[in-house]
A protein has these predicted regions:
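Positively charged n-region of N-terminal signal peptides that target proteins for export
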Residues: 1-9
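C-terminal motif of bacterial Sec signal peptides marking the signal peptidase cleavage site
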Residues: 16-20
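Conserved functional loop/turn residues at catalytic and ligand-binding sites
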Residues: 8, 12, 72
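Exported/periplasmic ABC-transporter solute-binding proteins
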Residues: 4, 22-265
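Lipid-exposed faces of alpha-helical membrane segments in multi-pass integral membrane proteins
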Residues: 11-14, 203
Length: 265
């Protein structure tokens, strides 16, 4: 009887160990809504390659950075560089790719090109009517992102409009900006180039059309980095480290390019 019980205990322990080994540790990411397309593409490719699940919580750049600090995720996602005060807290940023910030209008808007200076004047309220920039008579409706958005931070930094923009509507995601602009003939907004759809029109900036090629060669001025955020002195789990190594490797370059961004490596 004792021998039978011992064999049963060994069998149970063996089965438990096998179940534990069969489960891959998941990887959690949190942050920028603009990075959804590229991070979802990379996560899918990594899962097919390794069987490890990668979760993505689209909360915005600022919230993603806070999630890393609080230990709520493995890797944070930011569509802007880390600030000095964030680095001082022990955070480290690794550039994954570069993305253009498209200036978008309603498809029916006949304006197709704006200078960086004109864009700044529009968003600060100095220019208020489309007829003043070659469009139809209509009050310009300014759509932007919420405070702590990496896209907003990048846009305002490049156009030198920090704390000066006269937003009519502040959206909490890239998709919401696109929806708002597509439904209003007088609206203007900004959004990740990788996320822009046919429901809106991306205008040229100083004569340069936003594209992967013009972001890569630097001729398109309105661009920013996509950054992976980690704690400098905290070791990632084995699965998270493997995911980090994969998405920053040359092996993932084609996947990133397919998602509409310019890989940093």
């Amino acid at each position: 009887m004792k021998k039978i019980i011992s064999l049963l205990v060994v069998a149970v322990l063996f089965c438990t160990a096998m179940v534990g080994c069969s489960k891959s540790e998941s990887v959690s990411t949190d942050g920028s809504t603009s990075m959804s397309k590229v991070i979802e593409s990379l996560s899918e490719a990594f899962q097919e390659k390794t069987g490890t699940e990668v979760t993505y919580n689209a909360t915005g750049s600022g919230a993603g950075i806070e999630a890393v600090l609080a230990g709520r995720c493995d890797i944070g996602l930011s569509s802007r560089d880390l600030k000095d005060e964030e680095k001082a807290k022990g955070l480290e940023g690794t550039i994954l790719a570069y993305d253009g910030i498209a200036i978008i209008v309603h498809p029916g808007n006949k304006v197709s090109d704006l200078s960086l200076e004109t864009i700044a004047k529009i968003y600060t309220g100095e220019i208020k009517n489309w007829k003043d920039v070659g469009g139809a008579d209509g009050e310009i409706v300014l759509i932007g992102r919420e405070a702590n958005s990496g896209t907003r931070d990048g846009f305002e930094s490049i156009t030198d409009t920090e704390d000066k923009c006269k937003y009519r509507q502040e959206c909490t995601s890239t998709g919401d900006v696109i929806t708002a602009v597509s439904s209003n003939p007088n609206a203007i907004g900004y959004a990740s180039l990788a996320s822009v759809k046919d429901s809106v029109k991306a205008v040229s900036v100083d004569g340069v059309k936003p594209s992967e090629a013009t972001v890569k060669d630097g001729s398109y001025a309105v661009q920013r980095p996509f950054v992976l955020v980690t704690k400098k002195d905290t070791k990632l789990s084995d699965s998270a480290q493997k995911f980090f190594d994969y998405i920053t490797s040359k092996d993932a370059k084609e996947v990133s390019s397919g998602a509409g961004v310019v890989p940093a490596n």
